[in-house]
Amino acid sequence: MTGPITRKDLMIVNMGPQHPSMHGVLRLIVTLDGEDVIDCEPVLGYLHRGMEKIAENRTIIQYLPYVTRWDYLATMFTEAITINAPEQLGNIQVPKRASYIRVIMLELSRIASHLLWLGPFMADIGAQTPFFYIFRERELIYDLFEAATGMRMMHNFFRIGGIAADLPYGWIDKCLDFCEYFLPAIAEYQTLITRNPIFLERVEGVGIIGGEEAINWGLSGPMLRASGIQWDLRKIDHYESYEEFDWEVQWQKEGDSLARYLTRIGEMAESIKIIQQALEGIPGGPYENLEIRRCNKVRDPEWNNFEYRFISKRPSPTFELSQQELYVRVEAPKGELGIFLIGDRSAFPWRWKIRPPGFINLQILPQLVKRMKLADIMTILGSIDIIMGEIDR
């Protein structure tokens, strides 16, 4: 009598695109051997909207409302990179007051983005309580945004040569009060989360990335700094007025999910330091460069023709892009957000290439989850911090 034949079949599981832990419309095709992950294939494109092609058929001013739909949780950074590119292309000077206000808004947006990463990340690994504490602080930041820009999200606040409006009366004091309140809140997170043995069991030693490996994969932001590489564009490129403030680059050397968590927690405290220094030293003066707001190009009489209204011609230009190319980048919450811009002496970019940090960082996911358990996929994916709006564009 022969014994039973044991078969070893692999199981293929689809995670997403409608899965609460995917952080957007991301689909993962996971090959499993029991609970062990054999392979993982990310499927992208569910949120593709042709953002680069739209940019090439719009003036910079017309395109500004679109860019807040890339990373819709850190919209100040997408606005900053959109106006920094033509500013450098046209050698436009930004008033010091506008530069300080930009720094304040960027760092507030960084804190809000990290908070909205931390809450769902904790929920993914089974900790529901910190989620509500974290959203309490995030709501205060959105109140500050609403008072200054009129919008809680999708602010449309940055302009070429400055910002849309000056800070309202009493806003600086309100923001300083928030900074004093938020620093003890970070210590509260440390007590609730960092010293929790169950949390440490889920994240420590999970998804390890070495320093050389992180560089070879093109990682940036907290993903790179958590692997021992002290690389922060705010220190390296000296854009806006970051060189005038005293702060430290946050980094860890372990390269695991815990290191990425600690890096982002430290960045929130450093952002508060930058905001406090900017608020206390904010100069007076104008908040925009009025000269570049004027159109220097002579209007074409053809634009007034009756037939012109019906043939889908482009509107009159607002800012002429010189015939050259450049790459501009900023340190966004998720990593290096860049724009490759080619001008051709018109108001419309000849080429507008977006370098999204989440898209680059997501590439390493299949390698990180191999030979891990199925439950570790949520931990590793959450530690990467992705937003599908900027990944699919």
Swiss-Prot record:
Keywords from the UniProt entry: Chloroplast, Membrane, NAD, NADP, Plastid, Plastoquinone, Quinone, Thylakoid, Translocase, Transport
Keyword presence, rRNA-binding: no
Chief location bin: plastid
Assigned GO CC terms: chloroplast thylakoid membrane
Annotated PROSITE patterns: COMPLEX1_49K
InterPro entries named among the record's database cross-references: NADH_Q_OxRdtase_suD (IPR001135), NADH_UbQ_OxRdtase_49kDa_CS (IPR014029), NDH1_su_D/H (IPR022885), NiFe-Hase_large (IPR029014)
Single GO MF annotation: oxidoreductase activity, acting on NAD(P)H, quinone or similar compound as acceptor
EC number: 7.1.1.-
One biological process term in Gene Ontology: photosynthesis, light reaction
Pfam family, one: Complex1_49kDa
Membrane topology: Peripheral membrane protein
Compartment annotation: Plastid, Chloroplast thylakoid membrane
Record field: catalytic activity: a plastoquinone + NADH + (n+1) H(+)(in) = a plastoquinol + NAD(+) + n H(+)(out); a plastoquinone + NADPH + (n+1) H(+)(in) = a plastoquinol + NADP(+) + n H(+)(out)
Cross-referenced PANTHER family: NADH DEHYDROGENASE [UBIQUINONE] IRON-SULFUR PROTEIN 2, MITOCHONDRIAL, NADH-UBIQUINONE OXIDOREDUCTASE 49 KDA SUBUNIT
Biological role: NDH shuttles electrons from NAD(P)H:plastoquinone, via FMN and iron-sulfur (Fe-S) centers, to quinones in the photosynthetic chain and possibly in a chloroplast respiratory chain. The immediate electron acceptor for the enzyme in this species is believed to be plastoquinone. Couples the redox reaction to proton translocation, and thus conserves the redox energy in a proton gradient.
Subunit and interaction comment: NDH is composed of at least 16 different subunits, 5 of which are encoded in the nucleus.
Family: Belongs to the complex I 49 kDa subunit family.
Name of the molecule in the record: NAD(P)H-quinone oxidoreductase subunit H, chloroplastic
Organism per entry: Fagopyrum esculentum subsp. ancestrale (Wild buckwheat)
Origin organism lineage: Eukaryota, Viridiplantae, Streptophyta, Embryophyta, Tracheophyta
Underlying gene: ndhH
